[in-house]
Amino acid sequence: MTYGGRDQQYNKTNYKSRGGDFRGGRNSDRNSYNDRPQGGNYRGGFGGRSNYNQPQELIKPNWDEELPKLPTFEKNFYVEHESVRDRSDSEIAQFRKENEMTISGHDIPKPITTFDEAGFPDYVLNEVKAEGFDKPTGIQCQGWPMALSGRDMVGIAATGSGKTLSYCLPGIVHINAQPLLAPGDGPIVLVLAPTRELAVQIQTECSKFGHSSRIRNTCVYGGVPKSQQIRDLSRGSEIVIATPGRLIDMLEIGKTNLKRVTYLVLDEADRMLDMGFEPQIRKIVDQIRPDRQTLMWSATWPKEVKQLAADYLNDPIQVQVGSLELSASHNITQIVEVVSDFEKRDRLNKYLETASQDNEYKTLIFASTKRMCDDITKYLREDGWPALAIHGDKDQRERDWVLQEFRNGRSPIMVATDVAARGIDVKGINYVINYDMPGNIEDYVHRIGRTGRAGATGTAISFFTEQNKGLGAKLISIMREANQNIPPELLKYDRRSYGGGHPRYGGGRGGRGGYGRRGGYGGGRGGYGGNRQRDGGWGNRGRSNY
């Protein structure tokens, strides 16, 4: 018998050895779950609505009254592997030290060191091994036992450290222990992410590893029409990955609800707060039963994120991989050139000549404004470089196309603004070039972290101008911590009187010789009808028609 696209005979009860029976699990009688005192299906959320299609302000339920009416659920699935159990405290301490791992909280499970030790059921473990991973990352070694134990948790680790699988795989186990969705039910797992690009990437991982369990997922984000997302939600999805604003839209018009959510993930919590999503996050979380399991993931641990965790996590445990001090990956070579605005264009060409010596190069260039993105891209294409731009003025279809062209290497140069690039995770980026420096040191670290991921090496090049002097001291500190060469021209900005500002890196490897211009992009060098010096930008390279 099938129900809602999921095979009723797909039996996960053989997972009993990991935590007893799951109170019926996903193959139990759904009628017992649907026999709720509040009645009916969940469409319309708490309190219902008289007009299903009209936006209604979300009201926080009275959980003292509502929670006793809801069915109980299982969230602790962790059974410690005997190899893990037999490790001594000194061995565990040494492992955590080697992986720069800091923990806080009580009754924290020991870290695992192999996929088999995690205790995932075969239907999850087989998917992981099929991807060819050698061993878990540091955050996964400690994060999986934490998440599988059902505890609220905070995970702090650098971008690209494997955080997505740290919550995705335990989420799949969690779903398979719950009763099946009934018509009108919302998701069981909700993942909130700051950007549509990150949301789509999370969806890709959920689809890949949830396939064997026939788990459905839906990605809900702004910038595109709601119609397809509404259809997907109406069919029922165990996992919803969403940006906060669009999810609130869907909740207010009654197209989904959060009454079945028992596993909540806040991914890149620091970025969501940086982007001003705190009110939306609080409004969403208030709609979710308070006995849920909540997992918060972040690259940094500022006071705003700490406060959010204090307000919504219950007796959390925490793991941090790396220092709490802001730092850059030591796999990244940081090169900084102190330049004028008029020198940037020549320096950019120099580094592209170097990067292009690698036949599989990918270079991500950051600019400060949408206009500058387009200007740089136009100039590069006229000069024969295969460049495309991505920023907020482009519609979602074009953004997706540009990202795909960059990802598969057909256009190995992408120019982006910070907002457009947030959440983008593209494998194999060799170079990051900060044509314009970001507004703060955190964004600098986040930008250059697009290269040098998952053990690979990368190069970050930054053009630092006099206007960026406020970032000088912090930039130098980041470089020193990573044992980078600091150019003498930058050292004059090493003054503690400068507060937060913008780092500007530039740098130079010498070029490796000529680069044959690629055909088929743009229209040669002539005929550009504009002054390249507008926006303080291109300067005069002595070429005709510029």
Swiss-Prot record:
Domain Helicase C-terminal: 347-494
Residues forming coiled coils: none
UniProt motif (Q motif) ranges: 113-141
Region of interest called RNA-binding RGG-box, as start-end residue ranges on this chain: 505-530
EC annotation from Swiss-Prot or TrEMBL: 3.6.4.13
SUPFAM superfamilies on file: P-loop containing nucleoside triphosphate hydrolases (SSF52540)
Record-annotated Helicase ATP-binding domain positions: 144-319
Result of knocking out the encoding gene: Results in defective assembly of nuclear mRNPs.
UniProt modified residues of type Phosphoserine: S88, S90
UniProt-listed Gene3D superfamilies: P-loop containing nucleotide triphosphate hydrolases
Keyword hit for Ribonucleoprotein: no
SMART domains documented for this protein: DEXDc (SM00487), HELICc (SM00490)
Compartments, as annotated in UniProt: Cytoplasm; Nucleus
PTM annotation (Omega-N-methylarginine): residues: R18, R43, R509, R512, R518, R525
A GO CC annotation given for this chain: ribonucleoprotein complex
Phenotype for E268Q: Abolishes enzymatic activity
Effect ascribed to mutating K163N: Abolishes enzymatic activity
Lineage top rank: taxon: Eukaryota
Alphabetic keyword roster: ATP-binding, Cytoplasm, Helicase, Hydrolase, Isopeptide bond, Methylation, Nonsense-mediated mRNA decay, Nucleotide-binding, Nucleus, Phosphoprotein, Ribosome biogenesis, RNA-binding, rRNA processing, Ubl conjugation
Note: Present with 33100 molecules/cell in log phase SD medium.
Family: Belongs to the DEAD box helicase family. DDX5/DBP2 subfamily.
Domain comment (free text): The Q motif is unique to and characteristic of the DEAD box family of RNA helicases and controls ATP binding and hydrolysis.
PANTHER family: ATP-DEPENDENT RNA HELICASE DBP3
Protein name: ATP-dependent RNA helicase DBP2
Organism: Saccharomyces cerevisiae (strain ATCC 204508 / S288c)
